[in-house]
Amino acid sequence: MLVALVGGCAKSPSDKATQQQDKEPYRIGAVVDISGGAASLGEPERDTLKMLVDDLNAKGGINGHPVELTILDNKSLETEAVLAAKRLIDQNKVLAVLGCSASGTSLAMIDTVQKANVPMISMAASAKIVEPVKDRYWVFKTAQSDIVVANKIAKYLAAKGIKDVAFLSMNNAFGDSGRVNFEKAAPANGLNIVLAEKFEATDKDMTSQLAKVKASKAQATVVWAIPPSAAIITKNFRDLGLDMPLIQTHGIGNKAFLDLAGDAANGVIAPMGKLVVAEQLPDSDPQKAALLAYISSYEKKFNARPSTFGGHAHDAFNLAVKAIGEAGPDRQKIRDALEQTTGFVGISGVFNLSAQDHNGLGEDSMVMVEIKDGQWKLLE
């Protein structure tokens, strides 16, 4: 059964609420992986969305219209994601759908939103979510594309003089898309993939795959996964005593990975959105002020630091709000406004969307970081 969390204007100050009473609410839906395998992504996204809608309504909503945000948990299941999207479109009559947290659940919803002509803003990584653009007319996304991630990793390894690489990935849409794009980025940067192995998201041990890495001529290992798998394989990697760099992706950009991997996480290198190292950025960075503001608001509300995944939700919500504010309650005009958004300073990067690019983020949206003493440290 789908679980709905509804945010409205009930928590707004009385004067703002009174102003909103005469105007129809604007309805936005979100399908989030709050439980199940991708819960470590979905939980901070849910919390961020609830915080943002409360803050927005306290300030008067969108052009005086209160915002009703309905958040549905898809349980990290593709079938549940489709059902949730249909419910939001058919019953709630939402102007836009945000979600999902993961690539597989996001991809599963695309056909539904496209047929209904409803804008969708995913918070997941796979480039397939928005490509080819001609087949993704109604679909946008806020997480950095795995094309960007693959290129960042490949360039980093090449700069370190590494040639031979082992690649291990989750056997799902996230891992498969990462593998496809890393297989393109590697040769373009003079790298050889000497071994490619998969593991299931439910696996509790990846020693057999890592034993093959140890027996290969790999000089570095790239892992494409999210917690808990990403943490398990990191521990296995250390237990086997593999003496080479371990590179992961923005899929580990949360406290869950650090907690689950423990000391084994130290030394892991990954391209990340700037949120995890916001305080270490130069003051000239165009995102720094927005990042620090999000951290402050989230910590005040939840007594915890936000994750990069919460940042993807932050951007999805604010992009939708901006587009609705410009276009009004018209799905087609909202879609068009999204596509014309440029110079939008978000948490995941500075977005420059267009008819050719429904993600709008480049390699400058990410930095290389290393985990030292359980903390993210900027490498560049």
Map each language-model feature to its residues.
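Periplasmic-binding protein-like
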Residues: 88-101, 121-123, 166-169, 217-227, ...
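Segments of small-molecule ligand-sensing domains
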Residues: 297-310, 321-375
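Extracellular/periplasmic Venus flytrap/periplasmic-binding protein
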Residues: 83, 128-129, 137-241, 284-285
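Short, low-complexity disordered leader/linker segments with a strong preference
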Residues: 1-27, 58, 380
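Extracytoplasmic "Venus flytrap"
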Residues: 22, 26-50, 72-79, 101-102, ...
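Beta-alpha junction/loop-to-helix N-cap segments that form part of ligand/metal-binding clefts
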Residues: 13-16, 25, 40-47, 59-130, ...
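Extracellular/periplasmic periplasmic-binding protein-like sensory domains
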Residues: 234-312, 375-378
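Loop/turn elements at helix/coil->beta-strand transitions in domains of secreted/extracellular proteins
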Residues: 24-27, 64-68, 91-96, 115-120, ...
